[in-house]
Design a protein with these regions (language model features):
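Non-catalytic ligand/cofactor/substrate-binding and regulatory segments of enzyme domains
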Residues: 22-33, 37, 48-163
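Short beta-strand scaffold segments in enzyme catalytic cores
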Residues: 44-46
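A short, compositionally biased
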Residues: 39-41
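Activation targets extended, charge/polar-rich intrinsically disordered C-terminal tails
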Residues: 18, 138-231
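Bacterial N-terminal signal peptides that target proteins for export
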Residues: 1-6
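C-terminal motif of bacterial Sec signal peptides marking the signal peptidase cleavage site
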Residues: 14-15
Length: 231
């Protein structure tokens, strides 16, 4: 599993902690939805292409024939490596040479495409989804012609790694990027505190619906109260 000792300890502590209290929610929404996909060491965000205008996220047009796009951000050396070493992990944390954005395109629904992953469905407002798309667009580094710069093949689906903005480090990693994206979209998440995949998923149960879980989570609070909502 990819990861670092410090974040792993935090994940273990969070797993043993009681679940966060769930406050009464606003009126449930019918979408648009995004999906948080836990890959064990980091969390990606899957978006349905038909819900996002390419004028807001123009780079998505490259994969216009696919129903979903999943995105994630990370270190330029560590993230594209199928089996990252401890040495690469330490280098990413303390001597990162840059960052990349991974984009994967696919047609099956996220629960089917990522058949073994923990998944949380999050309902956004239309404005929230547009703000999320702007956040993703702003993460690309563009060339002189205004096009994204592909630097490596993607890990799954059809896609690629693209040169990205931002400096990767221990407290500014793939999971804090995902948490910031959710915060920009209007979700009540502590972006600075969610530095592990477990931390992001733990926070997201406050406002999302668990599609596929893992101990110790439950989808519906025992006391019948509802979730918070993204604005």
């Amino acid at each position: 599993m990819k990861g670092l000792t410090g974040p792993l300890l935090i994940t273990l502590v969070a797993a043993c902690a009681p679940l966060p209290p769930v406050t009464p929610a606003h009126t449930p929404r019918s979408g648009p939805f995004v999906y948080l996909v836990s890959h064990g060491w980091h969390v990606g965000i899957a978006v349905e292409q038909g819900e996002v205008s390419p004028t807001i996220w123009p780079e998505s047009a490259e994969f216009s024939g696919f129903r979903y796009l999943e995105v994630g951000w990370g270190d330029a050396d560590y993230y594209p490596t199928a089996h990252g070493s401890v040495g690469l992990a330490l280098k990413a944390t303390f001597r990162s040479r840059g960052s990349v954005l991974h984009v994967a395109a696919f047609d099956a629904g996220p629960p089917e495409f990522f058949g073994m992953s923990k998944i949380i469905e999050v309902a956004l407002s239309r404005r929230g989804l547009e703000d999320l798309a702007r956040f993703i667009h702003a993460t690309y580094v563009l060339d002189a012609s205004g096009r994204p710069v592909a630097v490596a093949p993607g890990i799954y689906g059809r896609g690629a790694f693209y040169r990205a903005t931002g400096e990767y480090r221990l407290l500014n990693n793939s999971n804090t990027w995902t948490a910031r994206a959710l915060a920009v979209a209007g979700c009540p998440i502590d972006a600075a505190g969610a530095i592990t995949a477990g931390g992001v998923m733990y926070e997201a149960r406050r406002f999302g619906r668990v599609i596929r879980d893992g101990a110790p989570w439950r989808d519906v609070p025992a006391d019948g109260t509802e979730r918070e909502a993204c604005r």
